[in-house]
Amino acid sequence: MRDMIKKENKLCFQHRMERKTEKSFQLSAGRQRLLAETIRELKQEGRLDEEKLAMQHGTTSIYRHSLNVAYTSLWMMERWQIRLEPKSLVRGALLHDYFLYDWHQKDSSHRLHGFRHPKTALGNAQRDYHLNWKEKNIIARHMFPLIPVPPQCREAWIVCLADKWCALGETMEPMFHVKHFK
């Protein structure tokens, strides 16, 4: 009987913690709207949907990874109460890996992908969209410190951090069967 009570208490605690985590990782309605509108705009103007065709980390597509980074960046901005340009933050986050190829395929052009893809992503994004300076900086500098030139604006620093956090979660997810994002 005692073991059953302990097990029930443990399950209740886990459920409370999951609910608390879900609530604490939610965006305000306004930020959710901004994210949805920006995704819609980028899909209409360019080739954002092509990111669905290739995987990024583990079982996560490049598209899903970009959404995760954009969401996490907005969450960090809200949670830490950092003054940023939310639209630039979201656009830069959604386009930071806009390189439009499957880097897992055996192809000599994909060698040193980690070092080269920010430049490719920036070139593709500039061809398909009108970018401001912050959005360009986000895309070009998100691989710091692998690429030793640091971000130059707060938005780029936040996306750089969010990218590392999401990449870790997405890579570890299949190993531990833990859902990083819904």
Roles of regions detected by a PLM:
Residues 1-182:
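Metal-dependent phosphohydrolase cores
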